């Protein structure tokens, strides 16, 4: 359970083309957690503890905004500093200075350029900060703030509010990310299948990076057809420390594509369609040998991943098409609308990695307890069906 008490003081003033905002914040966080957990690494272990954390956070921030007289140029410069009393590595404001800068300039009436850069800090999860070992000791006190340096730059071309084309490139660099000492996987790379994240021994040594380019266009044709599309090409990687090699992160889908259009028909009818496509995410195969051990399976009742082959496999690309039809009635003082929405009209199947499960039957009951194994089976994970929706909208 988390409970926050926050105090924030802020002042904003303006002078001609300048706007200045400065302030300070003081937060007190109470975190409580009662854990009973069985894990199996090389042998079975049990963690049974109660945690209470009372953390005092403090910070300073300031931003200066400037807009030129002709409004062609805008700039924003900011600085923030954060600290807390949880651990020695987190107590100094100067260790968590977060500068940020954004610029925008209209080169012509139709073409504009923009860019931004910033450094941001974030606390590790409270589940990790409050984790205790079998001797009831907080063992992650050495954790520090996570940081991300972010850069982006782009161009935008617009014509008569009828057509807009934007291209933007970005780069993000992550540092001091908590990594699991047991399996060497950063917490940010652990997806939903991992359950609770952070309740283990951690070290702030992992690094990550993501970079890519995004293209966006909007087109309004004859006030009837409205088209919009975007495609993002990117790469997401991580490494456990500075000496190791980068490998694919859990979010490395490579590309995301969307296109949608709406056509306005006579008598207040409209028809819309959307097509979405996303690249397959990488995944880690199971460690069948470890998972089949009776002592290992009984410790957590789910399979174990083969971290020596982390994210070596990749899921299939998934695409989906949706259609929506609207009919609108404009009455004297209100608007009444009816629509039918058909999601996934092709009934495309989203295929996930097969799940490894125990049958509950021991294959070698005559073996010693530590060597007994379950017979295992796999269950396919395919989802996706046509989903119709009928709706009514009313505005007064």
Model-inferred region functions:
Residues 32-39, 105, 109-151, 171-196, ...:
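Surface-exposed extracellular loop regions of Gram-negative outer-membrane beta-barrel proteins
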Residues 14-18, 68-71, 106-110, 148, ...:
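Outer-membrane beta-barrel channels and translocator barrels
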Residues 7-13, 60-66, 101-105, 153-157, ...:
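Residues on the lipid-exposed face of transmembrane beta-strands in outer-membrane beta-barrel proteins
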Residues 4-12, 48-61, 140, 144, ...:
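Outer membrane beta-barrel strand-and-loop segments of large Gram-negative receptors
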Residues 175, 227, 277-301, 316-320, ...:
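C-terminal beta-signal and adjacent terminal beta-strands/loops
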Residues 1-90, 106, 163-166, 224-230:
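Face-selective signature of the C-terminal outer-membrane beta-barrel domain
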Residues 15-17, 26-32, 56, 68-70, ...:
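Transmembrane beta-strands of outer-membrane beta-barrel pores
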Residues 67-73, 171-173, 194-285:
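Gram-negative outer-membrane beta-barrel transporters
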């Amino acid at each position: 359970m988390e409970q926050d008490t926050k105090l924030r003081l802020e002042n904003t003033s303006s002078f001609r083309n300048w706007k200045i905002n400065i302030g300070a914040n003081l937060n007190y966080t109470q975190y409580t957690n009662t854990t009973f957990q069985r894990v199996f690494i090389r042998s079975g272990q049990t963690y049974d503890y109660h945690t209470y954390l009372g953390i005092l956070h403090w910070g300073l921030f300031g931003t200066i905004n400037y807009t030129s007289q002709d409004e062609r140029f805008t700039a924003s410069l900011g600085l923030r500093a954060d600290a807390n009393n949880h651990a020695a590595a987190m107590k100094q404001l100067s260790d968590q200075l977060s500068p940020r800068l954004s610029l925008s300039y209209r080169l012509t009436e139709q073409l504009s350029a923009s860019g931004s850069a910033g450094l941001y800090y974030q606390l590790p999860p409270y589940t990790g900060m409050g984790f205790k070992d079998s001797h009831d000791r907080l063992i992650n006190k050495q954790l520090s703030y996570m940081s991300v340096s972010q850069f982006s730059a782009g161009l935008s071309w617009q014509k008569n509010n009828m057509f807009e084309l934007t291209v933007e490139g970005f780069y993000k660099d992550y540092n001091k990310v908590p990594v699991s000492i047991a399996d060497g996987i950063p917490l940010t790379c652990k997806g939903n299948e991992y359950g609770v994240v952070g309740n283990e021994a951690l070290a702030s040594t992992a690094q990550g990076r993501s970079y890519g380019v995004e293209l966006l266009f909007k087109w309004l044709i004859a006030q009837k057809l409205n088209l919009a599309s975007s495609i993002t090409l990117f790469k997401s990687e991580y490494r456990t420390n500075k000496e190791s090699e980068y490998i694919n992160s859990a979010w490395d889908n490579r590309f995301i594509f969307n296109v949608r259009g709406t056509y306005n028909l006579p008598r207040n009818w409209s028809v819309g369609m959307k097509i979405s496509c996303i690249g397959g995410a990488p995944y880690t195969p199971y460690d069948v040998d470890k998972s089949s051990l009776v002592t290992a399976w009984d410790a957590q009742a789910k399979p174990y991943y083969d971290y020596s082959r982390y994210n070596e496999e990749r899921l299939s690309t998934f695409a989906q098409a949706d259609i929506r039809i609207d009919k609108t009635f404009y009455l004297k003082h209100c608007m009444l609308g009816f629509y039918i929405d058909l999601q996934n009209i092709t009934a495309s199947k989203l295929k996930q990695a097969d799940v490894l499960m125990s049958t509950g039957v021991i294959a070698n009951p005559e073996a010693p307890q530590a060597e007994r194994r379950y017979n295992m089976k796999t269950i396919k994970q395919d989802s996706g069906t046509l989903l119709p929706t009928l709706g009514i909208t009313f505005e007064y």
